[in-house]
Amino acid sequence: SFLWPLEEESVKLAHGVDADYALEDYASFTLRAYQIFELGDMVAIEKALGIKGHNAIHPCRRCTLKGVRNVEGGEKVYYIPLQLPHGHEPSGGERDPANLPLRIHEDFQEALDAMAQAKTKKEREAISKNTGIRQAPAFGRVGSIDYARSVPHDWMHLLLENIVPNLVMLWMGRYKGLDSGTEDYHIDDVVWAEIGKETVEATRHIPANFVRVLKDIAKDRSGFTAESWCFWFIYLAPILLRGRFKRKKYYKHMLSLVEIMKTSLKYSLTSEELDDLEVKIIDWVQKYER
């Protein structure tokens, strides 16, 4: 694995390497360094943590919530909604977004120990299925990584490569064949044609240092990078989508996500801002599921 050389170097740095510090006289000391965070897209992190990940019964790397699937529709993909479908009852407060059953570092080791002690392959697979943990995580030799807390969700992949493009597809009525159900958040194609033209015009005179030229979002999104989605959603969408939804609540919901994204991009956050951000994220997700 390409991670092996990095772990080898991490082991050496944990033991320490000789270094010199220049003041009036050179003074020798032992330099140590530890990796405490790891970032990557969803699939890469799932492999690094040794978890089953998306589509598993316990897909989340941060909590132990059990996924559900549309059995009647023949779906095999598990997902974790806060509002459970009919026929799925929560146990206790497991669906309380302000009090999720979070994983802790020890959960990983306990699951691995249980699998190691399993007497049969079937027993081992059952433990893996019920915990969502497949195998030992990477970077386990030094011990500086907390498997439950040191691997946060990557902002770019979570928002710009997932949530934002999917929202646009939902608003276009082109997301996996889903209609709007009892809601009415679809924006008509003729309106999207106008939005696409305005997107092109909006970036025509903006210096390239801020954003590259954007194509017609209604016709061609293949060239939209994470940077493109970020600029379009945070700076253009609040103007381009104003008055375009049939009901104002969808526009306000979009603005709430814009505010969340802007806040999370700040270089520093106070404890009060973090608490406020948590409340706003929970509110956004709950309104999305409605």
Region spans (language model):
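Short, solvent-exposed secondary-structure capping/transition elements
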Residues: 15-19, 68-73, 244-253, 269-270, ...
